[in-house]
Amino acid sequence: MSDNSFGKLFRVTTWGESHGPAIGCVIDGCPPRLKLSEEDIQPWLDRRRPGQSRFTTQRREPDQVRILSGVFEGQTTGTPISLMIENTDQRSKDYGDIATRYRPGHADIAYDMKYGIRDYRGGGRSSARETAMRVAAGAVARVLLRTLVGEGVKIRAALTGIGGQTIDPSRWDWDEVERNPLWCPDAESVGPWEALLDSIRKDGSSIGATVEVVAEGLPAGLGAPVYGKLDADLAGAMMGINGVKGVEIGDGFAVAALRGEQNADPIAPGPQFASNHAGGILGGISTGQPIVARFAIKPTSSILTPVPSITRDGESVEVMTKGRHDPCIGIRAVPVAEAMMACVLADHLLRDHAQCGWGR
């Protein structure tokens, strides 16, 4: 059975392919009487929309969302919320050459091995085009969090590294993230990164990146031992983003080099934490501190450099990908990371309420 859904109480199912007529999602479990309209969703989709700079794919999709069900007179009804975006700028002819050839680094060969058939147009179901609906679902999750927790909830992500060039954390400025096309929080890194990406594009190649996402203003108590840990679900959500190859929570792999007294987050009355190496989660349960996740995303597999591969019949070939592609998919993964964080937190908020109520 395929797995096209995630979440338990706030459950999101996505559907559609890159070059199909439309993509969409169904959100089940959203509480009734939340104020919701397309205007609450569209701005988040606009942040992810392709073709907004020379550093992302030049596929031009307006990504106009339509609410098909679950909302009446501007409020959620408690029934499934169905959202849809029409695809308008497909160029399927660009992919005719790979109908029988496997693109190295893509899911082509894996899909064929599993299903014996694949939609080769733009990657079909495995395309990052699907993530537009995750962003749409994340917008609904934000409305839920804002309504049930408060306006103080903030979920923000940023690009923290490209091709081994990383930001200076001491210059982190969230306002700067919205001022440049790379979602970079360090103004001094933007110029060198743009020069690097221009060089990569000119070479017909691609490059990897790192993204960090932070959620603030959430209550303590989200997550449950031992198989419903908040950090486990966050790691799974981030790992499910196209191209992600590694996920960290808090200081992640860096803690392997620390001593116990260095890694411990001292606690004072309040409670107040002196540091946040744990990323806001202990024992799988949120502590009320900022929740921090980080991931590494691989270079875009679609490149102009010929790479050895095989056909469906096992013959040796070289594949040079045509079409419109991102030189660094990490850039447009930033709003997707925010959306996945929002969906997981909305799900865990409802799960916590179901078990513990609101009175804690």
UniProtKB/Swiss-Prot annotation:
Keywords: Amino-acid biosynthesis, Aromatic amino acid biosynthesis, FAD, Flavoprotein, FMN, Lyase, NADP. It holds the Pfam family Chorismate_synt. NADP(+) binds at residues 48, 54. InterPro entries: Chorismate_synth, Chorismate_synth_AroC_sf, Chorismate_synthase_CS. SUPFAM superfamilies: Chorismate synthase, AroC. The keyword Transmembrane helix does not apply. FMN binds at residues 125-127, 242-243, 283, 298-302, 324. Reduced FMN (FMNH(2)). One of its GO terms (biological process) is chorismate biosynthetic process. Pathway: Metabolic intermediate biosynthesis; chorismate biosynthesis; chorismate from D-erythrose 4-phosphate and phosphoenolpyruvate: step 7/7. One of its GO terms (molecular function) is FMN binding. Its cofactor is FMNH2. Its EC number is 4.2.3.5. GO terms for cellular component: cytosol. The keyword Nucleus does not apply. It catalyses: 5-O-(1-carboxyvinyl)-3-phosphoshikimate = chorismate + phosphate. Belongs to the chorismate synthase family. Homotetramer. This reaction introduces a second double bond into the aromatic ring system. HAMAP family: Chorismate_synth. This is Chorismate synthase. The gene is aroC.
